[in-house]
From Swiss-Prot:
The keyword Zinc-finger does not apply. Belongs to the troponin I family. The keyword Cell wall biogenesis/degradation does not apply. Keywords: Coiled coil. Expressed in salivary gland, gut, muscle and cuticle (at protein level). One of its GO terms (cellular component) is troponin complex. This is Troponin I-like protein. Inhibits endothelial cell proliferation and angiogenesis in a vertebrate host. Probably required for efficient blood feeding on vertebrate hosts. Rabbits immunized against the protein show higher resistance to tick infestation; feeding on immunized animals results in longer feeding duration for larval and adult ticks, lower engorgement rates for larval ticks and reduction in egg weights for adult ticks. InterPro entries: Troponin (IPR001978), Troponin_I (IPR050875), Troponin_sf (IPR038077).
Length: 200
């Protein structure tokens, strides 16, 4: 243990000396070069390249991991292929029935999952509407996009069709009738009275 501790101490001292030496060199360079920033353009370029390489490697690893995971899941779900080479007709029919049952089961599960997703989407939509109502924010309807050329065509079309009657105020025809005409249309009270008596 004594030798090992000595070796560790020497290693620490050596590292400290290296760090001290680097700091001294940096201080000398700073004094000699005036005010130069730590990140010189070359260092920035190197750092950028290193970051790009690292990001590309991580992306590649992630893609490989996802592809491997996908292969495992597919192999697990599909299972081993059935030997079809030396099979008679009865075994082939049995294998086909197994595959058919498996497909039906998977379609059933798929339908259930799709139904569940639709239900949850509906619930999410309802909850968002409630939240917006509570906040006082309302869903703005999507506006129909109209190009400026279509808009101009519509304006030109509306101005080209001149309709003078559309600008006139509409008037009720009954306002200008005389009261006498209204009275002439009405039946006398004695005629109405006899009808009322008959109804009773």
């Amino acid at each position: 243990m004594g030798d090992e501790e000595k070796r560790k101490m020497e290693e620490k001292e050596r590292k400290k000396a290296e760090v001290r030496k680097r700091l001294e060199e940096a201080a000398k360079a700073k004094k000699a070069g005036g005010k130069r920033g730590f990140m010189t353009p070359e260092r920035k370029k190197k750092l950028r390249n290193l970051l790009r390489k690292k990001a590309a490697e991580e992306l590649k690893k992630e893609q490989e991991r996802k592809a491997e995971q996908r292969r495992k899941i597919i192999a697990e779900r599909i299972g081993q292929p059935k030997p079809l080479d030396n099979c008679n007709e009865a075994t082939l029919v049995g294998i086909l029935k197994q595959y058919h049952a498996r497909i039906a089961q998977l379609e059933d599960a798929k339908y259930d999952l799709e139904y569940e997703v639709r239900q949850k989407d509906f619930v999410i939509n309802e909850l968002t509407i409630q939240v917006n109502d509570l906040r006082g924010k309302f869903v703005k309807p999507a506006l129909k996009k109209v190009s400026k050329f279509d808009k101009l065509k519509m304006v030109v079309k509306s101005t080209s069709e001149v309709d003078f009657r559309s600008s006139l105020k509409s008037v009720k025809k009954d306002a200008f009738k005389l009261d006498e005409e209204n009275k002439a249309d009405k039946k006398p009270e004695w005629a109405l009275g006899s009808k009322k008596e008959n109804e009773e």
